[in-house]
């Protein structure tokens, strides 16, 4: 059998690999705080209580929604920057789901992870970092917003270091 025939048959048998997701059910990275609140109210998987589940993070000036889950979901965390969802964290119920089953399903759907170690498996695209972590947690992160936040934090640290050095120089 010619090698070209083998190549085409093995390619046909391989399932199509999708990019890592930017959404879970009706909640997607980039949604506004109000859109996420509305989606949480409408989805029975979340036990969203309204504003008592919303916090303001004073150091970063960001909002965080934290709510209990039901069924397979223990808790959900939704972090915003400039009014847009950029981190979605789902803590899964280890009594109902296991790490191996989730990893196997994700690998079948999204291909081999770009990073894999005992603590996490990470799938990435240009815009999304999707990870399965231990304990049983799934994270969706908007990479562009996150990297901008990290760069801002590094710039702030540089300013603080410079201010510190100038203060010390006054003595």
Predicted region positions:
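Hydrophobic h-region of N-terminal signal peptides that target proteins for export
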Residues: 1-5
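Mid-chain, structured segments of secreted extracytoplasmic proteins
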Residues: 54-97
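Non-cytosolic coordination micro-motifs
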Residues: 6-53, 89-171
């Amino acid at each position: 059998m010619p090698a070209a025939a083998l190549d085409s048959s093995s390619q046909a048998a391989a399932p199509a690999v999708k990019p890592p997701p930017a959404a879970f059910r009706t909640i997607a990275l980039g949604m506004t705080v109000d859109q996420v609140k509305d989606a949480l109210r409408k989805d029975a998987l979340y036990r969203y209580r309204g504003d008592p589940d919303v916090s303001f993070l004073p150091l970063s000036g960001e909002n965080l929604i934290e709510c209990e889950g039901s069924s397979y979901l223990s808790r959900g965390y939704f972090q915003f920057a400039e009014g847009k969802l950029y981190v979605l964290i789902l803590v899964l119920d280890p009594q109902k789901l296991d790490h191996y089953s989730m990893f196997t399903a994700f690998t079948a759907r999204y291909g081999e992870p770009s990073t894999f170690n005992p603590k996490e498996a990470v799938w990435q695209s240009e815009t999304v970092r999707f990870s399965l972590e231990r304990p049983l947690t799934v994270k969706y992160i908007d990479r562009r917003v996150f990297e901008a936040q990290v760069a801002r934090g590094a710039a702030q640290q540089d300013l603080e270091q410079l201010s510190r050095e100038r203060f010390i120089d006054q003595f």
